[in-house]
């Protein structure tokens, strides 16, 4: 199984315009292409897939997708660190664990854990969409999962931030809220019209 490159995006201006009375067909094609333009996620996934394919071709020796393993995915993720924009403080840095350092420091810039985690998710999906078998997916390898966990824990300590997901409170169900409102209204109405009992010994 070889890497399937996407030479042009669906909305590329270099589409085949044809000749000889194809104006209306071209307009219809353009309109349908515009209506079926990929989502932001799909566009990013395609760019990531093309970037990974370029990395495999530039690898020494060049790698085919069929020979790609979790170890090669880790090489790719470490390669991307040189383009990172997230400051990750070293243990010896005085700002280690400081979420808002007051001054600059020489610590390196790295890819943020969240970016790497999202990238792996997109590439894992793209691998299978391009003919890869789920059981052979290198982006789902245990080594990749462990690496992402280590990056998350290290960056959380170095940057003094927490990556724990906050639990969102579920809003009350509309029907339940309406029922509660009706019950409260009925209770208030009933209380308003309920006459107090006569005092003991009152004349009938």
UniProtKB/Swiss-Prot annotation:
Give positions of region: Disordered.
1-45, 157-204
GO MF annotation: an example: DNA binding
**For the motif Nuclear localization signal, what are the positions?**
165-169
Q: Where is the composition biased (Low complexity)?
A: 26-39
Record Pfam families: ALOG_dom
Xref: PROSITE patterns: ALOG (PS51697)
Q: Which InterPro entries match?
A: ALOG, ALOG_dom
Listed under GO cellular component are:
nucleus
One biological process term from GO is: response to light stimulus
Per UniProt, residues of the ALOG domain are 40-167
Q: Where in or outside the cell?
A: Nucleus
Q: Which UniProt keywords apply?
A: Developmental protein, DNA-binding, Nucleus, Transcription, Transcription regulation
Its family remark reads:
Belongs to the plant homeotic and developmental regulators ALOG protein family.
Its biological purpose: Probable transcription regulator that acts as a developmental regulator by promoting cell growth in response to light.
Q: What is this protein called?
A: Protein G1-like5
Species for this entry: Oryza sativa subsp. japonica (Rice)
């Amino acid at each position: 199984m070889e890497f399937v490159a996407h030479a042009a995006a669906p909305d590329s201006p270099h589409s085949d315009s044809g000749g000889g009375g194809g104006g209306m067909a071209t307009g219809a094609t353009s309109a349908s292409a515009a209506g079926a333009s990929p989502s932001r996620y799909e566009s990013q996934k395609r760019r990531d897939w093309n970037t990974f394919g370029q990395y495999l071709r530039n690898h020494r020796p060049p790698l085919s997708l069929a020979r790609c393993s979790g170890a090669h995915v880790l090489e790719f993720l470490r390669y991307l660190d040189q383009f990172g924009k997230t400051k990750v403080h070293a243990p010896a840095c005085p700002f280690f664990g400081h979420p808002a350092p007051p001054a600059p420091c020489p610590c390196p810039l790295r890819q943020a854990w969240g970016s790497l985690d999202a990238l792996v998710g997109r590439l894992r999906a793209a691998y299978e969409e391009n003919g890869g078998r789920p059981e052979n997916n290198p982006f789902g390898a245990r080594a990749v999962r462990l690496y992402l966990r280590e990056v998350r824990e290290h960056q959380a300590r170095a940057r003094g931030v927490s990556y724990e997901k906050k639990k969102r409170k579920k809003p009350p169900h509309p029907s339940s809220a309406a029922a509660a409102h009706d019950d409260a209204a009925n209770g208030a109405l009933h209380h308003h019209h309920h006459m107090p009992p006569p005092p003991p010994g009152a004349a009938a």
